């Protein structure tokens, strides 16, 4: 969440078609890191966040939509609405399925994000799904394709094209893990999902790029056959 100074430089790069200035990028990277973020307990189980360096900013891009969908679903449940689907961009949270259905049908868009051409279909109940990728937000500079997803280890936008879809019990979990897998890559990313899946039975993921597709152990349990139109489409 402290990546905002670096992310801002890459947003400008997508607008101008020019790579971030190396000196400014180096300065921005000095403002990144959880060590520069303080959390102070407050009343009612709340925390007060503090930024210890001038120029620091917070960016919730890797978790906000998933969390918002999760909380919206919780609010509906609190009002007695148990059968619901909340979609915010590429992040979806679902409750109990529609009457007579085993789950909510959610289509996953292909790597290039093409509309009307779903690559596969999921069936979900009381779960969340998030897709992270760069089909819609990338820039090509000097023949290299840079994603809007920035690797915090290097401060550089990910190169190439990829799409990660994660199913989890909670929207925030699905959202943050989808972004994390984009950065870690298929081997380390899917290994992480398989490990975490031991404590979240719904957790599963699919990583696809221009060369290959890798899925976690529990992925196939969420697949659905084609049939009636989907309730939503999750896009990168």
Language model regions located:
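Mature catalytic core of soluble alpha/beta enzymes
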Residues: 1-236
């Amino acid at each position: 969440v402290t990546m905002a100074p670096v992310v801002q430089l890459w947003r400008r790069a997508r607008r101008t078609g020019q790579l971030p200035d190396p000196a400014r990028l180096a300065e921005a990277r000095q403002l990144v890191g959880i060590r520069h973020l303080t959390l102070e307990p407050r009343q009612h189980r709340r925390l007060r966040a503090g930024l210890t360096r001038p120029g620091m900013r917070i960016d919730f891009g890797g978790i906000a939509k998933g969390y918002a969908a999760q909380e919206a679903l919780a609010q509906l449940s609190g009002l007695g609405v148990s059968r619901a689907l909340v979609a915010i961009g590429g992040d979806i949270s679902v409750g109990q399925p529609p009457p007579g259905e085993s789950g909510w049908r959610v289509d996953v868009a292909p790597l290039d994000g093409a509309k009307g051409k779903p690559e596969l279909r999921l069936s979900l109940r009381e779960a969340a799904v998030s897709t992270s990728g760069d089909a819609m937000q990338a820039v090509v500079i000097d023949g290299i394709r840079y994603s809007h997803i920035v690797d915090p280890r290097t401060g550089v936008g990910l190169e190439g094209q990829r799409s990660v879809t994660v199913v989890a019990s909670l929207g925030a979990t699905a959202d943050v893990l989808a972004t994390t897998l984009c950065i870690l890559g298929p081997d380390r990313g899917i290994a992480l999902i398989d490990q975490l899946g031991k404590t979240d039975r719904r957790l599963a993921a699919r990583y696809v790029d221009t060369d290959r597709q890798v899925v976690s152990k529990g992925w196939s349990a969420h697949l659905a056959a084609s049939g009636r139109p989907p309730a939503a489409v999750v896009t990168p």
